[in-house]
Amino acid sequence: MTPEEVVERYSQVISRASHVTYVPIVPSRAENALVWDIEGRAYIDFLADAAVQNVGHNNPRVVEAVKKTADRLLHFTFIYGFPVEPLLLAEKLREIAPLEGAKVAFGLSGSDANDGAIKFARAYTGRRSIIGYLRSYYGSTYGAMSVTGLDFEVRSKVGQLSDVHFIPFPNCYRCPFGKEPGKCRMECVSFLKEKFEGEVHAEGTAALIAEAIQGDAGMVVPPENYFKKLKRILDEHGILLVVDEVQSGLGRTGKWFAIEHFGVEPEIITLAKPLGGGLPISAIVGRGEIMDSLPPLGHAFTMSGNPVASAAALAVIEEIEEKELLKRAQILGERAKRRLEKMKKKHELIGDVRGLGLMLGVDLVKDRETKERAYDEAKKVVWRAYELGLIVAFLQGNVLRIEPPLTIEEEVLDEGLDKLEEAIEDVEEGRVPDEVIEKVQGW
């Protein structure tokens, strides 16, 4: 089969609700930061498979753990039994989590983890209201979709949970209050206070769910003191802080959890994506009394705690520890960010470079003064990068997502950045035709 044939056959049998197209890559095999398609062409993966492959594609430790476990026990549901693998994983997650006395609930995706976090928060507090963030993305299951702050079509078609409210996330490059960095009064914090004085009853609010760094909103990093100020308000009213670490967790930002950069202790953390190293597994990690607030089977799935996926996840954490990947993410992140800042000085298309560790965003603009989003140009950059052998995507229509594996070799990182700059230059110089715009869907 050719890549074109595969793409066409996808359109015949795969629901469009399950897929979004950037480029027609048809993977055949992968190793660390490299992916080969079915025609043998190699690509550098600057997405880490949508932030899944923190320890690299087909990490040998993870593959070995999967093989050894699968040889003796593919599955035994821990709803009725006590397989050892999810126990060992839960104990390890409790050890690394930045909260005291944690207990764990397992699932299959970041979406169901965030759904579960909402259930636990409501059960523990006896309250109904949930606060989410505009432009946030928490998943596609019903509860996660309901607290997602993206203005996307699905909610208008299927409805959403009641008692969900939204506030703006602090974005110092595109401030929702029209302020400039260093010249504001933290209106992003006072907005929550005003919300409680108006349409939202604070004492009826169970939780606020936040990404420590907004990922699909365009890699938005809040001011350093934002979460401390926010947490004080939440604590005053007995409102839980739920932190979605699905994309930012497990070393991506240079710490186990991105919230650790901001000096607060949440009540609940959700994990998925990189946790299984490529296998489907999620985890809700929360204070013990919160995690015991639902009755038996209140958040249970037949396949959750799967022994093979749990063994893979434990191997991921061990790899991060033994290879010192937290430190490596910091070092490589600084290296990549320096290079991207140099690109910004040369290329007017780049309006902003931001992020922590290897969770980086490059905001493409038509005009640096107006900050008008460069939607078509972003599509062209992604397509041209693909032609050059680099896998990259955009968020919010114009922010390039730079999230390679934490294990990427320095020379491969540099080569990928070279390809990215070449793609940007080709777009600026008009060497990428307009017809590619229709080929790239994105979101």
Curated annotation (Swiss-Prot):
Lineage: Archaea, Methanobacteriati, Methanobacteriota, Thermococci, Thermococcales
Observed effect of gene inactivation: The disruption mutant displays growth in medium with L-leucine but cannot grow with D-leucine.
Catalytic activity field: L-leucine = D-leucine; L-methionine = D-methionine
Pfam families registered for this protein in UniProt: Aminotran_3
Modified residue annotations for N6-(pyridoxal phosphate)lysine: 273
Highest taxon above the source species: Archaea
Temperature-activity profile: Optimum temperature is 70 degrees Celsius for D-leucine to L-leucine reaction. Optimum temperature is 75 degrees Celsius for L-leucine to D-leucine reaction.
Species, as recorded: Thermococcus kodakarensis (strain ATCC BAA-918 / JCM 12380 / KOD1) (Pyrococcus kodakaraensis (strain KOD1))
Protein function: Amino acid racemase that shows relatively high activity toward leucine, which is the preferred substrate, and methionine. Also exhibits lower levels of activity toward phenylalanine and alanine, and trace activities toward isoleucine and valine.
Keywords recorded for this protein, A-Z: Isomerase, Pyridoxal phosphate
Entry's EC annotation: 5.1.1.-, 5.1.1.2
Family: Belongs to the class-III pyridoxal-phosphate-dependent aminotransferase family.
GO molecular function terms noted in the UniProt entry: identical protein binding; isomerase activity; pyridoxal phosphate binding; transaminase activity
Positions bound to pyridoxal 5'-phosphate: 110-111, 247, 302
Required cofactor names: pyridoxal 5'-phosphate
Known regulation of activity: Activity is completely abolished in the presence of hydroxylamine, a known specific pyridoxal-phosphate inhibitor.
Comment on pH dependence: Optimum pH is 5.0 for leucine racemase activity.
CDD domains referenced in this protein's UniProt entry, alphabetically: OAT_like
Record text on subunit structure and interactions: Homotetramer.
Gene3D superfamilies listed in its UniProt record: Aspartate Aminotransferase, domain 1, Type I PLP-dependent aspartate aminotransferase-like (Major domain)
Top EC group: isomerase
InterPro entries recorded: Aminotrans_3 (IPR005814), Class-III_PLP-dep_AT (IPR050103), LeuMetRace (IPR054934), PyrdxlP-dep_Trfase (IPR015424), PyrdxlP-dep_Trfase_major (IPR015421), PyrdxlP-dep_Trfase_small (IPR015422)
Name of the protein this chain belongs to: Leucine/methionine racemase
